[in-house]
Curated annotation (Swiss-Prot):
<comment type="function">
    <text>Catalyzes the transfer of a dimethylallyl group onto the adenine at position 37 in tRNAs that read codons beginning with uridine, leading to the formation of N6-(dimethylallyl)adenosine (i(6)A).</text>
</comment>
<keyword id="KW-0808">Transferase</keyword>
<keyword id="KW-0547">Nucleotide-binding</keyword>
<feature type="binding site">
    <location>
        <begin position="13"/>
        <end position="20"/>
    </location>
    <ligand>
        <name>ATP</name>
    </ligand>
</feature>
<keyword id="KW-0460">Magnesium</keyword>
<comment type="subunit">
    <text>Monomer.</text>
</comment>
<dbReference type="GO" id="GO:0006400">
    <property type="term" value="P:tRNA modification"/>
</dbReference>
<feature type="site" description="Interaction with substrate tRNA">
    <location>
        <position position="104"/>
    </location>
</feature>
<keyword id="KW-0819">tRNA processing</keyword>
<protein>
    <recommendedName>
        <fullName>tRNA dimethylallyltransferase</fullName>
        <ecNumber>2.5.1.75</ecNumber>
    </recommendedName>
</protein>
<dbReference type="Pfam" id="PF01715">
    <property type="entry name" value="IPPT"/>
</dbReference>
<dbReference type="GO" id="GO:0005524">
    <property type="term" value="F:ATP binding"/>
</dbReference>
<feature type="site" description="Interaction with substrate tRNA">
    <location>
        <position position="127"/>
    </location>
</feature>
<feature type="binding site">
    <location>
        <begin position="15"/>
        <end position="20"/>
    </location>
    <ligand>
        <name>substrate</name>
    </ligand>
</feature>
<dbReference type="InterPro" id="IPR018022">
    <property type="entry name" value="IPT"/>
</dbReference>
<dbReference type="InterPro" id="IPR039657">
    <property type="entry name" value="Dimethylallyltransferase"/>
</dbReference>
<dbReference type="GO" id="GO:0052381">
    <property type="term" value="F:tRNA dimethylallyltransferase activity"/>
</dbReference>
Amino acid sequence: MDKPAKRIVMIVGPTAVGKSDLGVYLAQQLHGEVINGDAYQIYRHMDIGTAKITPEEMQGVPHHLLDIADPTVAYSVAKFKKAATAMIDTVADRQQLPILVGGTGFYLNSLRLNLPLGGKAPPTAIRQRWQVALATNGQSWLWQQLAQRDPDAAQQIAPANTRRVIRALEVGELTGRRFSDQPQPAPLFSTLVIGLTTDRAVLYDRINARVDAMMQAGLLAEVEQLLKTVPADAQAMQAIGYKELVPYLHGQAELANCVALIKQHSRHFAKRQLTYFRNQMPTHWFDLVAHPEDKNAIVTLVQQWLKQR
């Protein structure tokens, strides 16, 4: 099978490791444009809590798929895949390199693997039965059920990714064929994945400092303004940094406790992000916090990859 003609670079990793800065640098060095791959930066009026890149930080580099949805509207991976695919085509047709930057792994993998989305949902009874079994027996047991029925699929799906484990089990029941034997769509793009990480203690310190900076920059006021028009149970308001402040604004919690929760949830999320990218995406890892000079090695890596046929 020939490789897809259009090539894209993805910059992935946990929160607070410098993905946005690297995206700008690569775009400047490689005639690129940045496409957002963060599930919450697509929302308007959610700037501080999502660490959305500012116009000044863009340094003139075009950025796409930021501020494209109202916070009252639910967004989905299917909508993202459609919008991102169209934007990649537009950028590539301009002879520019599409550079996707973000930490929402499933959004990015939907593009990398050309995952089929928006199809017919499995019957509720099957899904509920496996969800009950998961709640009763745990994720290790659930994954073992998949491993017994479809070892190839189990090798590709982490036990912690219970949603996809259940999906694989459902498909097997629905079709009578193993999930791994289902016809897979051909990738639309050839993809190089660059991952950023750093020492865990350093990462957690950076996360804590970032949350403090967000609070000083006016995150509380941003959340308060959103709540004037956006329900607290809206999808957008489930973002870390937003949902934790709602109880304080409703007079139900102390501010210091809410901020501590933002830090805790952000650290836990960073750990989950790293687990996902390590298990689900073939990634070239770099630590630009400890070795900022390695950004030039990343440029060289991308240049060599672009020359491959």
